[in-house]
Amino acid sequence: ATYKVKLVTPDGPVEFDCPDDVYILDQAEEEGHELPYSCRAGSCSSCAGKVTAGTVDQSDGNFLDDDQMADGFVLTCVAYPQSDVTIETHKEEELTG
């Protein structure tokens, strides 16, 4: 399946289609959008965003705890879309602050 991903970035929103077996960060880059990242392995908070609508599968990540995920935080480098999804990007400071 392919879902619509909307990223709300500091430069404004961007939308693109993302297959459910491609990480959102990878697909965003494929579409020409630059997002923050560091490890690309779900082990840090550089790429953190916040899901405001829809659902993702980020079971490949290990940095976020259950409370953070319940609050909507997502690591875009290990997140697969599970529905049409809206994510606010550049949330590392909010997460770690």
From Swiss-Prot:
MF (Gene Ontology): 2 iron, 2 sulfur cluster binding; electron transfer activity; ferrous iron binding
Any Gene Ontology biological process: ferredoxin metabolic process
Cofactors that this protein relies on: [2Fe-2S] cluster
Cofactor note: Binds 1 [2Fe-2S] cluster.
UniProt protein name: Ferredoxin
Gene3D superfamilies according to UniProt: 3.10.20.30
SUPFAM superfamilies: 2Fe-2S ferredoxin-like (SSF54292)
InterPro entries listed in its UniProt record: 2Fe-2S_ferredoxin-like_sf, 2Fe-2S_ferredoxin-type, 2Fe2S_fd_BS, Beta-grasp_dom_sf, Fd_pln
UniProt keyword annotations, A-Z: 2Fe-2S, Chloroplast, Electron transport, Iron, Iron-sulfur, Metal-binding, Plastid, Transport
Record localization: Plastid, Chloroplast
GO cellular component: chloroplast; chloroplast stroma
Family membership: Belongs to the 2Fe2S plant-type ferredoxin family.
